[in-house]
């Protein structure tokens, strides 16, 4: 007999505003527990020091997490000049202290130089794995292991403000996936000749998702209390916070098909649409309803890439 999943079936995406001081995985587990969800995953870890947007994918949405992992991100970062640390943030030990003798003009010039494509080595204090073990675990043992250089793209890095009394600068960064803001700050400190480390990092956007859609754990707890006071199911308020699955796929081309074609597609059969399909993943909509992603097969027909099990129940299997 198959083992029954604990929890209830929940499908959708929650834009959690992760608080400071907890790991992304702990935030995920707390949220999954509150929703009593059978299945959940996050898309793109934030350090315990960092706050901000952490998309939590429930149920069928977990099939499309890669699209959010691959998308660009936006951050607001504050950096302390004059101090370099082992981790490039305030969680690490200070390894050097220098006087800060920089002007706003110098800051603006050096910050602007980071815009564009470049190579970046991941920090040893990151969750990337080497031989199945996170890099930060090696770093804590004083072991440095080889890391592959990554191509990154800084779409924009703007100077926001400079607190000259405390030697703290604030910047806004719009970057490609896999970009380490701590590394950018550390490199900036070296260019300025004084060292620097991150003291605040807040992710304001993941792809097209805006900051206004974020929900905090405190807000979720307040809704739970409201549901209890009104003697209604928590899902009455919690599920209203979830975004549709296909909001993770806004950058994909869309193919619209009929309900009959959707029935064929949802049961794993390829469809000849008699059109020139684009390369790569395609968002498939049947009779106005999102039913999964597809791709072009060798014959030029539309085949299933990732289908939705929930949609199979809505269709009768074709003869």
Swiss-Prot record:
Catalysis: reaction(s): uridine(55) in tRNA = pseudouridine(55) in tRNA
Protein name as annotated: tRNA pseudouridine synthase B
Family: Belongs to the pseudouridine synthase TruB family. Type 1 subfamily.
Annotated organism of origin: Pseudoalteromonas translucida (strain TAC 125)
Keyword Transmembrane: no
UniProt GO BP: mRNA pseudouridine synthesis; tRNA pseudouridine synthesis
Pfam annotation, one family: TruB_N
UniProt function note: Responsible for synthesis of pseudouridine from uracil-55 in the psi GC loop of transfer RNAs.
Top enzyme category: isomerase
């Amino acid at each position: 007999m198959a083992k029954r999943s604990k929890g209830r079936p929940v499908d959708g995406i929650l834009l959690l505003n992760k608080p400071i001081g907890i790991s992304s995985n702990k935030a995920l587990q707390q949220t999954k527990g509150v929703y009593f969800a059978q299945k959940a995953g996050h898309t793109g870890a934030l350090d315990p020091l960092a706050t901000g947007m952490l998309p939590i994918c429930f149920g069928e949405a977990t099939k499309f997490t890669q699209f959010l992992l691959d998308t660009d991100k936006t951050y607001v970062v504050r950096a302390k000049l004059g101090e370099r640390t082992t981790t490039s943030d305030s969680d690490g030990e200070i390894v050097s202290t220098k006087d800060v003798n920089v002007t706003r003009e110098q800051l603006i010039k050096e910050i602007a130089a980071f815009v564009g494509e470049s190579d970046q080595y991941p920090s040893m204090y990151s969750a990337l794995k080497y031989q199945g073990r996170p890099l930060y675990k090696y770093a804590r043992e004083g072991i440095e292991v080889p890391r592959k250089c990554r191509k990154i793209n800084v779409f924009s890095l703007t100077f926001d403000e400079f607190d000259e009394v405390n030697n703290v600068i604030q910047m806004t960064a719009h970057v490609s996936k896999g970009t380490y803001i701590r590394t950018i700050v550390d490199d900036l400190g070296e260019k300025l000749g004084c060292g620097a480390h991150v003291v605040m990092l807040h992710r304001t956007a993941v792809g097209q998702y805006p900051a206004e859609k974020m929900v905090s754990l405190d807000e979720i707890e307040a809704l739970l209390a409201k549901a209890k006071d009104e003697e209604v199911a928590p899902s009455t308020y919690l599920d209203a916070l979830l975004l549709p699955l296909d909001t993770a796929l806004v950058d994909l081309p869309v193919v619209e098909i009929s309900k009959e074609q959707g029935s064929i597609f949802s049961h794993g059969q390829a469809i000849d649409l008699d059109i020139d399909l684009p390369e790569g993943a395609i968002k498939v909509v049947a009779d106005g309803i999102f039913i999964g992603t597809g791709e072009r097969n060798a014959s030029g027909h539309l085949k299933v890439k990732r289908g939705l099990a929930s949609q199979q129940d809505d269709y009768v299997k074709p003869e």
